[in-house]
Amino acid sequence: MGPCLRRGTATGLAMYNLLSGLSVIEASSFVASPTAGLYCAQFGAEVIRVDQIGGGPDFRRWPVTAEDDSLYWENLNRAKKSVALDLGRPEGRELLQALVRATGQFVTNFPVGGFLSHATLAEGRPDLITVRVMGWPDGSPALDYTVNNSVGYPMLTGPGPEPVNHVLPAWDLLTGAYAAFALLAATQRRGATGEGGEVRLPLSDVAIGTVANMGGLAEVLYSGENRPRLGNAVYGLFGRDFTTRDRVRTMIVVVTPRQWANLIAALNLGDAIATIEATRGVSFATDDGLRFTHRDALYPLFERAIAARDHADLAAAFDAGGIVHSPYRTMLDAANDPALVANNPIFGAADNPSGFAYPAAGAFATVPQMERQAPRPAPRNGQHSEEVLSERLALPAGEIARLIDAGVVGVG
């Protein structure tokens, strides 16, 4: 049996139809696993999210509106269909199992064992692909905010000495993207071999594996010590926050020799830099590492030069020189930036379940050869229950009505 081809049509259009014909059942909550489904849906897959009637544990997660509608939920679940079942009852669990078997692709963060174990689901569907997001490899729970602590980043973040958590659930988001990638890799393998299987993706492995890929493990094992706390400075190159004369705090990062030369010229620091180079016997022209190593001499020089200029003046000079910079601003500032949001083609209007109208993000990637469609809204809980049970399980209308009356199936 191959991947289940779409038989129904979701409301509206996909952002792109690159995954048209691929259907996925998703039973998940919080960030990582729903993100995998979101990315698949944005590229045209039919993603059917199955939840408890009334919503899962993240259905009212903050931020919420005054009416308690989750803005978080309605953005992480855009472009999906919704089936609501009473998963506390055997009949509801059996319906979910049947949907998974009928579809052939399953993304979840439910535990390895139990009624959604791969072994149980693969009975009668040996080519089933299950992608299971986990906390730790042994099945114990974890969250982004605890895994982040475990791999050491809070002890690198901020100026010290106390650990500093970052507020972006980066490991969740990276895990979700990797889960979507793993799903497509597994379908590619099945297309070549006919074999299904389970992919287990622990959040902790994504985190520590990423640390390793960035050279972090090798660095500390080679040196035998931890990297120093640098605040907002960038490790290994010239990059830091500075404050202008009109009190605008801006981040400046230099990654090429040309940018370095243009930064020096924009701030008229050629002679001062030459003096430091002569005194210390180094050249900063092409060496990121030397600029970082000698930051004790360079930072004060740049602090004074930048503090003597207004931000608008500096920004114009930096833009002319191709220097990478950006002022710090609030998320509300970002939301009101026309270039970033209002005039950005990844955003569009959607009929959101909350009733609140705001720019909705579609696929982040742009495919110039294809027309981008508007983002689709998130579904209401149970909005597609009748449609999916009819089309995917071939249940007659009378049987679906019985299940609804019995409280096994919910409709939105």
Where are these regions (language model features)?
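Aromatic-enriched alpha-helical interface/lid elements that frame and gate functional surfaces
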Residues: F238-G321, H325
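Mid-domain beta-loop-alpha active-site segment that forms a flexible
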Residues: V167-L184, L203-N213, V255, Q259
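C-terminal core of ALDH-fold dehydrogenases
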Residues: I306-P368
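A short glycine-threonine-serine/GTX helix/turn-capping micro-motif
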Residues: V164-L174, G196-E198, R229-L230, L237-G239, ...
